[in-house]
């Protein structure tokens, strides 16, 4: 019975300490970039294959394309090229890998993502024949159209000057920043880009501090905290101390458990050997008595069998209500499902094999020396 305590103690150590060690371990979240020219990815963004998923917020997953360009995949669109990330104002500048952002905007829907337009207005896309007389307020979209027709974009309120040969293709709410850049600087660097913003998680105050970065408090929470280290999660002193303490305790406790288990197993084996030796000696003494002995000192088999015999349950409580846990003859603990026999009158109980061997040699209780009477039905 006692040998079963060893694996139980070991299981308790593993179940308690190892989840605690895992929960206390905060993986480092270094900044990464796909190349020297690409944007730097850090919280709330995480760079797939280069940073642990726990380093980024849900919906802020970046991927390296061709080992040089950084892309962002939104739920309802194909990946965008990431040209710039402003962590202090929480804005991101996106581009189309095919250099035709206008085509992407015709079906663009940022819902379902953490991003939204900085400002949006309704704009109208027109299709006009090549020979149409177009005013300066209409901006051509060179990457759309074909040999016979062209696409133009115009603010909704300027539709009054639309030539009769043109027709409306689509009216869409689009980022105002894209249209201003497109119409003001049609050949400039930002003319094909789109700015989006995110509001959650809000790390703007933290980003404005010197050498401060946002990050998760721990691996099991979505709460954000401002760290003084440039690598949030690396210098969480409390968690590191807890981890060291746990590691310091696991080794000694495991060794102590093994030692206790060995002592318990050895004690159990010794008790078992004593019990077997007592039974063997008593049994041998009985069989060695001369067959022609006239007067038997012990009790006969029928009298012994008349005394109460009970199989112990999980509580190992004796049927007499006694709190004894050790057999007085062999001095080993009672175990579940072991059989005990109790003597009448004095109500002392023993292992069945122990007391049976004793009573074959002696007619008195080995504890109180009283002579039990045979029970009659």
From Swiss-Prot:
CDD domains linked to this entry: RING-H2_EL5-like
Membrane topology classification: Single-pass membrane protein
Pathway listed: Protein modification; protein ubiquitination
EC class (word): transferase
One cellular-component annotation, GO: membrane
Catalyzed reactions: S-ubiquitinyl-[E2 ubiquitin-conjugating enzyme]-L-cysteine + [acceptor protein]-L-lysine = [E2 ubiquitin-conjugating enzyme]-L-cysteine + N(6)-ubiquitinyl-[acceptor protein]-L-lysine
Database matches in SMART domains: RING (SM00184)
Zinc finger (RING-type): 327-369
An individual GO BP term: protein ubiquitination
Enzyme Commission number(s) of this protein: 2.3.2.27
Record field: transmembrane: 244-264
Coiled-coil ranges from the UniProt annotation: none
Pfam families per UniProt: GUB_WAK_bind, zf-RING_2
PROSITE patterns xref list: ZF_RING_2
A GO MF term: polysaccharide binding
InterPro entries, sorted: ATL20-22-like, WAK_GUB, Znf_RING, Znf_RING/FYVE/PHD
Subcellular location: Membrane
Domain topic, free-text comment: The RING-type zinc finger domain mediates binding to an E2 ubiquitin-conjugating enzyme.
Family according to the record: Belongs to the RING-type zinc finger family. ATL subfamily.
Name of the molecule in the record: RING-H2 finger protein ATL22
Gene name, Swiss-Prot/TrEMBL: ATL22
